[in-house]
Amino acid sequence: MLAVYLHGFILSAAMILPLGPQNVFVMNQGIKRQHHLMSASLCALSDIILICAGIFGGSALLSRSPLLLALVTWGGVAFLMWYGWGALMAAWRGDGVASSATSVTQGRWRILVTLLAVTWLNPHVYLDTFVVLGSLGGQLLPDIRPWFALGAVTASIVWFFALALLAAWLSPWLNRPVAQRIINLFVGGVMGFIAFQLARQGFGL
C-alpha cells in the first residue's frame, strides 16, 4: 500500500512542480498576502476533484470528446491571454497592491473567479489528471486504487500550501514596487507563453 501511495505522490508532484497558471497565480497571491490560503485551498480542492474523477473513471470522457477538449483549449487560450495582458499592463503602470477594505472585499470574489478559470480552463490540468493519472490509476486493482489517489491528492495539497506560505513569507522583499513590476512582467510572460503553446496544440502544430 505504501509503495502505491508513494507512486501516486511522486507522479502527481512531478506534474504539479513545473511552472503553470495555477502555480503562478498562487505564488502571486502569496506575495501580495491577499487570500493566499484561500487560493491554495481552492487549487487543492479542484485538484482533488479532478484527480479522483480521472482515477475513478472520468478519463474516458475527455478521450472520447475532441470537441470538449477543443472548447477547453481555446477557452484557456483566451483567458490566459487576457490575464497575461492585464499583468503586463499592471507592470507598465506600476500598479501596487490595493490597500482599502473595499478593494480587498471585491478582490476576494475576483480572485475566486480568476482562480477557477485558471484551473478549469487549463487543458493541461485535464491531461495530467484524466489522461496520465487516470490511465495509470485505472490499471490498478480496485482495492489499492484509493491509495494511489490519496498519494496524488496529498502531493497537490502539500505543494499549493507550501507555495502560498513560502511566497507570503518572502513578501516583504517581493512586494516592493520594483519587485512587483518584475513579477508582473514574469507573470505576463508565462501566461502568454502558455497561451501560445495551447494555441499551437489547438491548431495541431
From Swiss-Prot:
Compartments it resides in: Cell inner membrane
GO MF entries: amino acid transmembrane transporter activity; L-arginine transmembrane transporter activity
TM helices/strands, residue ranges: 1-21, 42-62, 67-87, 111-131, 147-167, 185-205
Other remarks in the entry: In Yersinia pestis biovar Mediaevails str. 91001, the CDS has been disrupted by IS100 element.
Catalytic activity: L-arginine(in) = L-arginine(out)
Main location: membrane
InterPro entries hit by this protein: Arg_export_ArgO_enterobac, LeuE-type, Lys/arg_exporter
NCBIfam families for the chain: 2a75 (TIGR00948), PRK09304.1 (NF006801)
GO biological process, one term: amino acid transport
Gene behind the chain: argO
Family: Belongs to the LysE/ArgO transporter (TC 2.A.75) family.
Name this protein carries in UniProt: Arginine exporter protein ArgO
Domain of life, per lineage: Bacteria
Protein task: Involved in the export of arginine. Important to control the intracellular level of arginine and the correct balance between arginine and lysine.
Membrane topology of the entry: Multi-pass membrane protein
Keywords of the record: Amino-acid transport, Cell inner membrane, Cell membrane, Membrane, Transmembrane, Transmembrane helix, Transport
Entry GO terms, CC: plasma membrane
PANTHER family (alphabetical): ARGININE EXPORTER PROTEIN ARGO, ARGININE EXPORTER PROTEIN ARGO-RELATED
